[in-house]
Amino acid sequence: MPGSPRRAPGLLLQALVAMVSLALVAPFGLQPALWPMPRSVQVFPRLLYISPENFQIDNSPNSTAGPSCSLLLEAFRRYYNYIFGFYKRHHGPAKFQDKPQLEKLLVFINLEPQCDAFPSMSSDESYSLLVQEPVALLKANEVWGALRGLETFSQLVYQDAYGTFTINESTIADSPRFPHRGILIDTSRHYLPVKTIFKTLDAMAFNKFNVLHWHIVDDQSFPYQSITFPELSNKGSYSLSHVYTPNDIHMVLEYARLRGIRVIPEFDSPGHTQSWGKGQKNLLTPCFIQKIRTQKVGPVDPSLNTTYVFFDTFFKEISRVFPDQFIHLGGDEVEFECWASNPNIQNFMKKKGFGNNFRRLESFYIKKILDIITSLKKSSIVWQDVFDDQVELQPGTVVEVWKSENYLNELAQVTASGFPAILSAPWYLDLISYGQDWRNYYKAEPLNFEGSEKQKQLVIGGEACLWGEYVDATNLIPRLWPRASAVGERLWSPRIITNLENAYRRLAVHRCRMVSRGIAAQPLFTGYCNYENKMEK
């Protein structure tokens, strides 16, 4: 850790730890309200003044990431604009030349920087930040920690009543509590333009989320444009303009990478697949009534070899397109009625000795899909239904707990069985309610279940989910933010950070900060933002 910054004579304060309100640092409304709260914060009363004309963000001379690290260079430019975005250049010299100034922020990467890599579950997001005259130093082992530290530094800078940029001398040491901190978006119920996804990724970076769970297809539409099976989107999308082309996917992946965000695609099956059947013949199960075939189709047909040939080829493509180690396979809400009505399925189950136990049929199918993913050297995530239905899961399969009933008990059962878990049950943001529902999201504690320390280490994080039945590009951003910010702090900050009133004060400022950066985050309650008149800029 770097040494403590200089203290102004006679003004020495005890270090302000994370639980203490930052209102002491600056007047309310101008305070550098940190969100999410870092693991360790020391803020001192000595103010440094910043001249936008002279201030620089640059690589430290001995950093392993040099001037060729385009990820960092782009981040330096981006955060300079975030900090000084509404600044109007003065004519003439700055008025505080005789006062202590901060002239630079130097960024030092200690290990292999990973400038050209994609982030992963094991990426190191830790960093330390020392702010003192005349140069601040941001240290990180990898570029991912530097990105998180740049966000924190930007939140420390504020403007006084005269428009002067200032920052308090500070020392911060920080790292995330959980490695998986996600936002789920749904692009099947409503297509989301790529620009809207970009805006979501921006806001995620402001809140230190690191996973975009992309629920890309579902019953309603199939907007993913497959190279191998183009008819899936040609016939399954809402229209030929409501698709994500290979170039669209590439742009989203790169935009996310530059912000230290992983993109995990979800291709849910055997249920939630009605749109698949429009472009892939004989994939879905024909439904019968009294042994007469109807026009209706049900889940994927698990009895046909052609089903697994298709998925083997399809997931080979997905494994090439999406670089992340994980693919989400869904597996939720499988309806057995259509399978039960189909004579071919009945005969298949007899041959396999499944009797009338359709959970065994589901298990047979899911295991085949899991084997395909494993053969591609990828790992799987499934919804809790797969675990609840006693499907035989491979070691390391991640179970996402989404059902609100007894979700803590579910976490206990999943982890007791040795499987990693992701929690999303208390964070379904599509379930809107009047008032400050963010407080309920904030109070949800992922590890508040009875279990051993080993079990709790298997909880790798959580996700805020915004399903798309009533959400499109017109309301996605204000419905997500700042409500998802509460989840962001719960997943990043130490468990002891629980004070709601302190959180409200900081989140109100953070919400205004997001507004100033072009994120149309809805208000927490009554009040105002300094930059509201410039939202459209």
Swiss-Prot record:
Subcellular compartments: Lysosome; Cytoplasmic vesicle, Secretory vesicle, Cortical granule
Glycosylation sites: 62, 168, 305
GO MF annotations, alphabetized: acetylglucosaminyltransferase activity; beta-N-acetylglucosaminidase activity; beta-N-acetylhexosaminidase activity; carbohydrate binding; hexosaminidase activity; hydrolase activity; identical protein binding; protein-containing complex binding
Key words, A-Z: Cytoplasmic vesicle, Disulfide bond, Glycoprotein, Glycosidase, Hydrolase, Lipid metabolism, Lysosome, Signal
Active site: 333 (proton donor)
Reaction(s) this enzyme catalyzes, per UniProt: Hydrolysis of terminal non-reducing N-acetyl-D-hexosamine residues in N-acetyl-beta-D-hexosaminides; N-acetyl-beta-D-galactosaminyl-(1->4)-beta-D-3-sulfogalactosyl-(1->4)-beta-D-glucosyl-(1<->1')-ceramide + H2O = a beta-D-3-sulfogalactosyl-(1->4)-beta-D-glucosyl-(1<->1')-ceramide + N-acetyl-beta-D-galactosamine; a ganglioside GM2 (d18:1(4E)) + H2O = a ganglioside GM3 (d18:1(4E)) + N-acetyl-beta-D-galactosamine; a ganglioside GM2 + H2O = a ganglioside GM3 + N-acetyl-beta-D-galactosamine
Keyword Isomerase: no
Top EC class for this record: hydrolase
InterPro entries (UniProt xref): Beta_hexosaminidase_sua/sub, Glyco_hydro_20_cat, Glycoside_hydrolase_SF, Hex-like_dom2, HEX_eukaryotic_N
S-S pairs: 69-115, 287-338, 512-529
One BP annotation, GO: chondroitin sulfate proteoglycan catabolic process
Regulation: Addition of GM2A stimulates the hydrolysis of sulfated glycosphingolipid SM2 and the ganglioside GM2.
PANTHER family, per the entry: BETA-HEXOSAMINIDASE, BETA-HEXOSAMINIDASE SUBUNIT BETA
Quaternary state and interactors: There are 3 forms of beta-hexosaminidase: hexosaminidase A is a heterodimer composed of one subunit alpha and one subunit beta (chain A and B); hexosaminidase B is a homodimer of two beta subunits (two chains A and B); hexosaminidase S is a homodimer of two alpha subunits. The composition of the dimer (isozyme A versus isozyme S) has a significant effect on the substrate specificity of the alpha subunit active site.
Family: Belongs to the glycosyl hydrolase 20 family.
Name of this protein: Beta-hexosaminidase subunit beta
Organism of derivation: Rattus norvegicus
Protein's gene: Hexb
